[in-house]
Amino acid sequence: MEWDGILAGIDSGRYDIAANGIDVTEQRSEKYNFSTPYAFNRTALVVRGDNEDIKSFEDLKGKKTTNSIASTYMILAEEYGAEVVGVDTLDQTIMQVLTGRADATLNSEVSIADYMQKRPDANIKIVALTEEANLVAIPTRKTDDSASLLEAINQAIAELREEGKLSEISMKYFGRDITAETVGEAAE
């Protein structure tokens, strides 16, 4: 499923929840109830390896970025004055940057680190990270029926956190613990 269809599925009643690294935002909180955050993730600003013009989010003004459609990254790029081109996948955003069709992309620090680990020869670099981490949680519909579901999700997250399983899974797949509010520290 394409990214922009995930939340639409909740809106239409097709899904009760969505679990796909979804950031909690003020706008989304108006439409959905969110679980307790299970991860904390900063936004990475990524450019081609030879780009020396963009060093900070402020440098995006007047530049072209490529971002996942309807993502928090697209909104953030627009807030910094970038011209935004929407695509469906992370691979597409990186390809746009590599081919020079876009100057930069914004995405999850964890997703970019994973991409770079799997493709160490990719000619990209992270030039900036947001200071604040985004809260990552599971959205549910705002209905009376979803209250018990949200309670069960929160209980499961609490149990996994207390047992150390959330941290263990994070270390296994991301090489760092993104389940704690202190993010960005690589595994030793």
Residue ranges and their predicted role:
Residues 35, 70-90, 94, 116-120:
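Ligand-binding cleft/hinge of the Venus flytrap
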Residues 1-4, 13-25, 48, 68-72, ...:
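Beta->alpha turn/N-cap motifs
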Residues 1-8, 52, 70, 85-99, ...:
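Short helix-initiation/N-cap motifs at beta->coil->alpha
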Residues 21-30, 76-79, 103-133:
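A ligand-binding cleft/hinge motif common to bilobed small-molecule-binding domains
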Residues 40-47, 113-154, 176-188:
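Periplasmic-binding protein-like
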Residues 57-70:
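Short loop->beta-strand "edge-of-pocket" segments that line small-molecule binding or catalytic clefts
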Residues 1-59:
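Acidic, polar ligand-binding/catalytic clefts
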Residues 75-85, 124-126, 157-188:
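Ligand-binding clefts/hinges and TM-proximal coupling segments of bilobed small-molecule sensing domains
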